[in-house]
Amino acid sequence: MSEEPLPGPRCWFAANLGWLRDPAGYHARQRQRFGDPLGGWLGRLRLALTGSPAGVRQVFAAPLDTYAPVGVDLAGMLGAEALPVLEGAAHLALRRRVNAVLLEGEAAQAGPAILAIARAEIAAWPRGRAMPAGPLLQRLSFAVIMRVVFGVIAPGRAEAYRAAFARLARHAGIGLVLLPALRRDLGPWSPWRRFLEARATVHRLIAEDLAAARASSDAARFDTLARLAALREADGAPSLSDAAIRDTLVVLLSAGHESTAAAMAWALLHCWATPGVLPRLRAELDGCDGAAASLLRLPFLEACAREALRIAPVAPMMVRQLARPMTLAGHDLPAGMLVGASAELAHADPAVFPEPEKFRPERFLDARFRAHEFFPFGGGRRLCPGARLALEEIRLVLAVLARTPGLALADHRPPRRVFSGPLLAPSRGGPRILLQEQAT
């Protein structure tokens, strides 16, 4: 076993800058040069990054006491009781409760609501002019996650949330994660002050609705907020603190709509731009009655959604921090070092996905990929609780898009993949589309 530092770039600043400039290609080039696992950096913390099936499996399957809370100040951004911040027993306990709520509440019955929202939103899109699809899909996806979290909500209240989260997204750049110096309040125009003010607005809105849910006696409510607020211990005390519910909802509302909207934008681009895919998808849809349950059983529709998540993973890596030493692929890693499973590298492995640069949905019809080969929503104990809902939403929205008359790409040039907060999204607002005027 090697006791030498992992091969990789030595300068933390240059490594972070290279990743920021080219998040989709930087680590692939570094791995080609240095091998797997790759030594790298996240901020000023050393990182061991792997995309090999064996390495990813080891990262995901490590015992519970292997990891500690990540030294990057995620708590300062997401909240001290957010799922991505917690480790060990606290993480497992919150995860079980959130999973139970998402599997039994509004999220478990969201299919018809997603279809209704998608049809209404897409019917209102402007016609006769080219426009970026990204903002339109973000609005649609935010409407879906609002329905899941809050149920039916007054339009004015929904718009207040939309504006608050849009402001939060503008000020929660990846630079705040990578560069600790930016997380200082230097006055009204400093990045950290603007982030804190945007987050305070979001927290205030959630606190108001949480207080109303705590005081409500409506047992018929099945929205996520109401069900989290209603959880009780054996002695009748609330299972979750207000802070835990608030931090959980911030993650669900922000990551839940931004990541799904980005995935839908890539699915739209590739399905419309890849010869043969859209006709095959429409033929499959023509044989379906259009109900949500029926659409969710269509194999090629699901394959298109999964291939979009493979070719352009929205979350480029899943990172943990070692609480104790680990040996990864023959390299001894010390406690305190970060280890990451890279979806970016794993999803482009030609040994697992032949011709990985090509959009080929049929690969998901011909084979079943294991959890350490295809993991767009994370893996192991860190699998995203909203994974099932997100995949359903991508499929149902893609079905509505494919059935929308006159929808075409206005520009076949693919956008670049760039950071939007900690996630990767299409540049320039995503693919440009054109909805032709309807004949009268």
Protein language model regions, located:
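Cytochrome P450 I-helix active-site segment
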Residues: 5-10, 111, 115, 167, ...
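Cytochrome P450 catalytic-core helices
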Residues: 259-284, 388-405
